[in-house]
Amino acid sequence: VADREDVDGIVITHGTDTMEETAYFLDLTVHTIKPVVLTGSMRPATAISADGPLNLLEAVQAASWPDLGKYGVVIVMNSTVHSARFVEKTDTTHADTFKGRQMGCLGYMQDGRPRLYQQPLRKHTWSSDLAAPKELPAVAIVYAYVGLTADDVRRLAQGKAGLVITGLGHGKMPELVWQALQPLMEQGLVVVRAARALGGMVTQVPAYDGTVTADSLTPQKAKILLQLALAHTTDREKIQAIFDAY
């Protein structure tokens, strides 16, 4: 659709539960300068003050603004414009559920057009070198917690090309889990360390040499980027370079 000459912008209606994941996948794989906007609703059409109609109207208005494509794929909800990379669903029921907790929003919808105040610097859409393969490599997310065992992780790693560890603090994990992962990594398993904390980033530390770090990506977005990276290469250093660029 993005390649059609009669299409100036794209609006996708989507359920809110996984909207941020679809938005980020498209942000990495749709190579276009045209606006791509996702939107949805938190309240049903039968509810008093349903949010769907206004969200859809403002999504279309946003997609009609040609310069929006420079910002990558966005989510427009509750009169707010969010970058696909940073947006998260933060509340189970509230209409203002989508937040850019790390870096804030890109801007707001006002008077029928987006008014934007910052621009993503990481690679996306028209600057992305990643492409969607016919089949994505298998990657699982492991949530670290008190009591997580090595056997739990070994089971989850079976048949997987990569694991994303939703780590404690700065991407840490129980020592026995780390010991169990090292031989799997030697066999080719790629391990990405993300954080279960709501802010901050995960960076390299000597204690977890050989892992890839997710920087400020949420675990679910780190999984998407790892799948696309593994479709291109299995070299850990090259995968880290991809995470540093996107």
Where in the sequence are the language-model features?
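Short acidic, glycine-rich surface-loop motifs adjacent to enzyme active sites
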Residues: 4-19, 159-170
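C-terminal non-catalytic interaction/assembly regions of soluble proteins
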Residues: 170-246
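Internal gly/pro-rich beta-alpha loop/helix module
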Residues: 38-110
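Short Gly/Thr/Asp-enriched flexible loops that form oxyanion-binding sites at enzyme active sites
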Residues: 12-34, 173-182
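Accessory alpha-helical/coil subdomains and C-terminal extensions
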Residues: 83-170
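Short, ordered loop/turn segments at secondary-structure junctions
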Residues: 15-16, 41-44, 168-170, 195-200
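Short coil/turn connectors at secondary-structure junctions
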Residues: 5-9, 31-36, 68-72, 77-78, ...
